[in-house]
């Protein structure tokens, strides 16, 4: 935790996170130029929450945006055109360009139509934000097969389907940026989210593989792990005073805080950033670790189950990870 503690105290002079549409940041943006001018961007799950804020900021930064959202409930049920249409309307009111798309990411052919929508509407595609998601939490032994599979389909398979449909375009034009959403539920762990955690950690592997495979074609792939209040965590219980206090703190972490790093990763200023995992919590940005060996042991004559028990495990146990959750690791108030 030493490096994390140092990161907590690092303040960048003059840095800020700006909510799209506010007067002063808008003036600053005009002075600085637009980081996504002329680009075509897909944002999945863009009808509400984090996806909405990403779509709004990308448009404010000059991108033409495909606002994808089938308008399902937090558990994936139902559908509505309104969320995507309302975001498109808001973008147009602010002088931007956007089209709505209502396809699901959970199946290959509909997902490919999201990419087709960008080409048909804007003639090109420069970036993909895989943000779409649902939640169906349950303690593992009570989790249904359907609950597990449906979350995997939207988060992991959805990220694959949309990325795969865009990959050949990016290969041909030798440029492009993928931004995938992971979670500390996968990176660290959480109760009752085996489906969500498996999907989100799978997305990290997907992103790294894309980064390795496509770096030679100048195509980038990164992950963002958000801390933000959205409808997907709006079902947190508030039965006790402690739970109410926790929710009050989380509600301060608005989804607009996540959008700036996503817009950055989509832009040319991030041309040398790929294969990384970033977390955002209020005004903090973290570069997250990736799996590497911690300790090693060796025995010239090899190991048996007995010698592992007697010598191997005792030597390694001091470096074991605890069964931590995200709240155990990020245990200070958001800045």
PLM regions: where:
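The beta1-alpha1 cofactor-binding region of Rossmann-like NAD(H)/NADP(H)-dependent oxidoreductases
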Residues: 102-116, 145
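C-terminal helical subdomain
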Residues: 244-335
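Substrate-binding pocket helix/loop in short-chain dehydrogenase/reductase
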Residues: 91, 139-140, 147-152
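Active-site-adjacent segment of SDR/Rossmann-fold oxidoreductases
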Residues: 54, 60-61, 86, 168, ...
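Canonical Rossmann dinucleotide-binding motif of NAD(H)/NADP(H)-dependent dehydrogenases/reductases
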Residues: 33-66
């Amino acid at each position: 935790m030493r490096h994390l503690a140092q990161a907590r105290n690092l303040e960048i002079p003059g840095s800020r996170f700006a909510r799209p549409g506010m007067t002063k940041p808008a003036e600053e943006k005009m002075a600085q130029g637009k980081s996504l001018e002329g680009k075509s961007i897909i944002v999945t799950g863009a009808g509400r929450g984090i996806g909405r804020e990403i779509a709004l900021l990308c448009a404010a930064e000059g991108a033409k945006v495909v606002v994808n959202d089938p308008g399902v409930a937090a558990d994936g049920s139902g559908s509505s055109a309104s969320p995507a249409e309302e975001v498109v309307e808001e973008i147009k009111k602010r002088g931007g360009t956007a089209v709505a798309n209502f396809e699901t990411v959970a199946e290959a052919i509909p997902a490919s139509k999201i990419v087709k929508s960008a080409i048909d509407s804007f003639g090109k595609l420069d970036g993909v934000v895989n943000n779409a998601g649902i939640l169906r939490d349950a303690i593992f032994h009570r989790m249904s097969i359907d609950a597990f599979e449906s979350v995997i389909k939207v988060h992991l398979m959805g990220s694959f389907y949309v990325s795969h449909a865009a990959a050949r375009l990016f290969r041909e034009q030798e440029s492009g940026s993928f931004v995938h959403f992971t979670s500390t539920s996968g990176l660290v762990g959480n109760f009752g989210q085996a489906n969500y955690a498996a999907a989100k950690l799978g997305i990290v592997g997907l992103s790294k593989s894309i980064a390795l495979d496509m770096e030679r074609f100048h195509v980038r792939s990164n992950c963002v792990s958000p801390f933000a209040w959205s409808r997907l965590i709006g079902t947190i219980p508030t039965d006790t005073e402690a739970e109410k206090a926790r929710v009050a703190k989380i509600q301060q972490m608005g989804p607009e805080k996540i959008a700036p790093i996503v817009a950055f990763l989509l832009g040319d200023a991030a041309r040398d950033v790929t294969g990384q995992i970033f977390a955002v919590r209020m005004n903090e940005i973290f570069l997250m670790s990736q799996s590497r060996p911690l300790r090693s042991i060796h025995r010239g004559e090899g190991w048996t189950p007995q010698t592992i028990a007697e010598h191997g495990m005792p030597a390694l146990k001091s470096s074991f990870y605890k069964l931590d959750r995200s709240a155990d690791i990020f245990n200070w108030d958001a800045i």
